[in-house]
A protein has these predicted regions:
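C-terminal catalytic "cap/lid" subdomain
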Residues: 1-94, 98-368
């Protein structure tokens, strides 16, 4: 294990009274420092800025309106990072604040720049402390308490391990807070099994809960990143995981040969619309090597521009691919169902292909 992404949630960073868990965070940073000094590269994805801001402002209940959440985050983010900076400094390590939004994943150039920046920081033995830029985010501020962000960062860096730290010992067969018979799940070999688990809701401090963690684990597993969900309050939890101790829930990864571009397209680029295709087009795409042509498109859903990502669904409604469209939703509605020669006669300025095969990834291909 060389590169590790560690995500710590709001319920681990702060208690129910909005105080930072200073002793716990000091232990976590010491654990990370030991890994870095041992030659490993660690990225810390940390929630808690909103809770930290609430404490400073004297706001006891987590705000529900986005402007209030953003204001609390603006107050808390700097203070939270300053605390991490002091803790890492105690171990002669430098921390770097990295704030990301979905737009950084949406645009390929921004995505590559973010990846290159993180890689350079890691080569310098700097610990990137990543959080969503809640002050400018909109829908992103409810993005699963950073779980999916952590998975996307792990995929971006092709990390060896994603660790999601929470206030429970891992995933259970049911919610242990309400069911005394709930059993800890030690290993998940098929990530699709996670959907069957009855996981609990988010804590008072956080936004995601275990459901966000299972979604992140499924995403990471498909991109060949192993995930461990464990209790962040356990001393030395990261070192224990890295050395192979039986700690938390381990979700195994699937080997993949997908390119960095296809992983970005599948997991980072937001989908702006959906294209329904006929059976012939679905079959041609599934066999690989084919582009999506207008003649195979039966319905267009959503509002999108050329260059946006769209989901492609078969007649039964199953998503079979994602790709970057060459035309807007408005143009595609005009030309769907047309053969190439008809398209050229009606709209000669449009491409013959709706999605070129080089800009398309089959669902499941990333696990191949």
């Amino acid at each position: 294990v060389k590169t590790i992404v560690v995500k710590v949630g709001s319920s681990t960073v702060a208690d129910d009274h909005l105080h930072l868990r200073r002793r716990l965070l000091a232990g976590l940073v010491a654990d990370i420092a030991g890994l870095v000094h041992g030659g490993r590269r660690v990225v810390l994805v940390s929630s808690g800025a909103i809770a930290c801001g609430q404490h400073v402002l004297g706001v006891t209940e987590r705000p529900r309106q986005v402007p209030a959440l953003q204001a609390a985050s603006a107050v808390g983010q700097g203070r939270l990072f300053a605390h991490y900076e002091r803790l890492f400094g105690d171990h002669e390590l430098t921390a770097a604040q990295v704030l990301l939004t979905s737009e950084d994943f949406n645009r390929r150039d921004s995505y590559v720049n973010a990846r290159n920046t993180l890689r350079r920081l890691l080569t310098w033995d700097v610990v990137p402390v990543v959080n969503e830029n809640d002050t400018t985010a909109t829908d992103e501020i409810r993005f699963g308490d950073n779980d999916v962000l952590a998975a996307q960062v792990a995929i971006m860096l092709r990390a060896d391990l994603l660790v999601l730290l929470t206030d429970q010992d891992g995933l259970y067969t049911s919610d242990p807070r309400t069911d005394g018979a709930a059993e800890l799940v030690r290993k998940v070999t098929d990530p699709e099994q996670l959907a069957a688990l009855e996981v609990g809701e988010a804590s008072r401090r956080g936004a995601g809960g275990m459901r966000g963690k299972t979604a992140a684990a499924v995403m990471a597993a498909a991109a060949d990143v192993r995930t461990v969900i464990a209790n962040g309050s356990r001393p030395g939890v990261l070192s224990a995981i890295v050395t192979g101790e039986d700690v938390g829930t381990h979700i195994l990864a699937r080997a993949t040969s997908a390119s960095a571009f296809k992983l970005w397209l599948r997991y980072a680029k937001p989908v702006r619309g959906t294209l329904e295709v006929d059976a012939g087009a679905a079959r041609a795409l599934a066999q690989g090597g084919s582009s999506l042509l207008p003649v195979g498109v039966t319905a267009v859903h959503g509002t999108f521009a050329a260059g946006d990502a769209v989901a492609v669904v078969a007649p039964g409604g199953e998503e079979i691919a994602r790709g970057l469209t060459t035309m807007s939703a408005r143009d595609l509605r005009r030309v769907r169902g047309l053969h190439s020669e008809e398209l050229r006669a009606l709209s000669p300025h449009l491409d013959d292909e709706v999605v070129h095969r080089d800009r398309l990834v089959l669902v499941g291909e990333e696990a191949g």
